[in-house]
Structure formats: C-alpha cells, structure tokens
Regions:
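Positions that flank functional sites
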Residues: 50, 63, 181
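Catalytic helix-loop patch of NAD(P)-dependent Rossmann-fold dehydrogenases
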Residues: 1-44, 49, 56-59
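Histidine kinase transmitter module recognition
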Residues: 34-37, 54, 69, 169-173
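C-terminal substrate-binding subdomain of Rossmann-fold SDR/epimerase-dehydratase oxidoreductases
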Residues: 4, 70-192
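A general structural signal for well-ordered alpha-helical segments in protein cores
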Residues: 28, 63-64, 122, 126
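Glycine-rich "substrate-gating" loop/helix at the edge of Rossmann-like oxidoreductase active sites
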Residues: 16-20, 48-60, 80-92, 115-118
Length: 192
C-alpha cells in the first residue's frame, strides 16, 4: 500500500464482504474483454472513498455516517478501534479525475482516482470532523461492539491509492479533508 492499478489483492470468495470487490473485478474484466474483442473504447476508473454533496447518508460507509451524525447533532460513534486508515477524495477532485481519464487515458487501462495525501485513521477523521463544527459540542465515542446486527466489519486496515498513473495524465487532487468535509457538511445543512 499504496495500491497500484496492477495489484489485485487477496479476496476470500466465501466472505460475505467479498461480493462487492468481486463484482467490480468482473465488471472491469468485461469492459477490457469488449475492448480487446470488439474494439469498444473502454477506460476504467477505480474511485477510492469519494465523498461530497449528494452522497447517500445512510449507506453504511463510515464517512457518510459521520456526516449524518454531525448534520443531526449526534455524537459520532465508531464501531471499531478506529485505527483503520482510508484516503478520502472530495467529489470535485474525483470528477476532474474521471474526465482526465476519459479525455486523456488509454483504452483498456485502469486508473486509480483518489487522494493519496488525505489518508487518515477513522478515529482521527471523526475528531477532525467534530472540530470543524465546535459550536455543536459533539464528541467521539468508541463503540467496540456494533449495535446494528447487520454491521459487517471490514478486515482492510489500510486503503490508499497509488495515483502516479493518472498523475502522468496531468491530474492531482487539491482539496484537503478539512475543506472537502466542511463543504460537504455545509451543503447538507443548507439544503435541509
């Protein structure tokens, strides 16, 4: 880690959580197959933890849960030890990355889209987000046993993209965690 485009990792097909990653692999294989067999122009983007206005706040992703908690004036609950790290990319940066790949990328190739400079632990993200809105007087609570029976813990302790390949096309993300999440949370507060 950081994860390059040619690194596929190990997946246990008997693990319930593997269906998500396996379905993405299958879709990429189909796209590349159609490109090679039929000449269908295909470029693949692999987004890493993209957030921003319009994202679903109830899909179970940790950052969506945190944003929903802040919007609804709830303390942030972490259902783990909070040490897992993720690299978060603001939607405006990701969108520019997608268009960069579309316009400049090579057919049949995959490109990681993410912000390698915004890797942060779940616990630190929660604290940074509540510190963006100190007037709300929120706190972070570590809840080592999830209350939700449907909650599935991730066994991925670190997830960060290697973005040199798309960088060679001229793209780099520019939005910090503080700026991106402030914009995101304010957009929901102003929308509601």
């Amino acid at each position: 880690i950081p994860t390059k485009e040619d690194q596929y990792g190990y997946l246990d097909p008997t693990n319930l959580r593997s269906c998500y990653a396996e379905s993405k692999r299958m879709a990429e294989t189909m796209c590349v197959s159609w490109f090679h067999q039929y000449g269908l122009p295909t470029k693949i983007v692999r987004p890493f933890h993209t957030y921003g206005f319009g994202m679903s706040l109830d899909d179970g992703r940790v950052y969506a849960d945190f944003v929903a908690d802040i919007i609804n004036d709830r303390d942030i609950q972490i259902n783990s030890d909070g040490t897992a790290t993720r690299a978060f990319c603001y939607i405006a940066d990701a969108t520019i990355g997608f268009f960069t790949v579309l316009l400049k990328g090579e057919n049949g190739q995959a490109y990681n889209i993410g912000n390698d400079q915004c890797e942060i632990s779940v616990f630190d993200l929660a604290n940074r987000l509540i510190n963006l809105f100190p007037d709300k007087n929120l706190k972070v609570i570590k809840n080592m046993v999830a209350n939700d029976r449907e909650y599935l813990r991730s066994n991925v302790s670190r997830n960060c993209p290697y973005i040199t390949k798309v960088g060679n096309l001229g793209w780099r993300p520019t939005t910090s965690i503080e700026d991106g999440f402030t914009r995101t949370i304010c957009s929901f507060l102003n929308y509601v």
